[in-house]
Amino acid sequence: TFIVAGHETTALTLAWALYLCAFDPRVQERAAAEARGVLGGRVARPDDIPAMPYIARVVNETLRLYPPAAFLSRTALAADQLCGREVRRGDTIMLPIYALHRNHVLWDRPDSFDPDRFETTPDRYAFLPFGAGPRICIGAGFAMQEAIIVLSTLLARFRFEAIPGRAPEPRLILTLRPHGGVWLNVTPRLRVAE
C-alpha cells in the first residue's frame, strides 16, 4: 500500500524538516503561527492543506536540501548523447538528485534553507524529489499531504530546538538518512483553546 511503501521517506522528510526548523527559529515560528491559526489546537486534516502554504514550502525546501531518494537511475531505451557522451541502449544513467538540488546554476544560495524560494514554481527539471516523467513516484501527492499534516500538527503543539554538537550527518543508504538520528529538544507550546 501507499502508506507502507512511503513510510520511511516521509519519516525522513519530517526528521530533516524538524532539524531545519530547529536551526532557523524564524522559519519555525512563522510555520507554527500559520499552523496554529488554521488548526486552533486540533490535529490537521487534508482539507487544511490549502490554508497552510508556508508549511508546504517548508516541506518542499526540505525535500530540495535532503531528498530521501538522493539518486535516480534510468535505463536508456535508445542510443543517444548526454552532455557530449555516448549513451548506448540499455546503459544505466544515474541522476544525482542531491547534487541537482544544490546546483549553483539552478538555485540562488543553494545551500541555504529558504522556504520562500518556493513562492514561485521552480524549473520542472531543477526540483525532482519524486522523480519525473512516467516513472514519477506514484505516491508523491499522498507523501506531500502526509508530511504537511504531520509537520503542521507538530509545529503547532511543540517547539523544537537544536542540541549543540548533535548535528546529523547525511548518509546515503538507499535513502538519504541522518546518521546518528536527529536529536532535538522538544518543549510543548501553550495550548490553544480547542
Report residues per predicted region.
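Conserved cytochrome P450 catalytic core segment spanning the I/J/K helices
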Residues: 1-13, 47, 52, 75
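Conserved cytochrome P450 K-helix E-x-x-R motif and the immediately C-terminal K′/meander segment
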Residues: 42-83, 104
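Conserved cytochrome P450 K-helix/beta-meander segment immediately N-terminal to the heme-binding cysteine loop
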Residues: 95-121
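Cytochrome P450 proximal C-terminal region
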Residues: 36-41, 136, 141-194
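Cytochrome P450 catalytic-core helices
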Residues: 9-34, 140-158
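Residue-level recognition of short, solvent-exposed, well-ordered loop/turn junctions
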Residues: 88-89
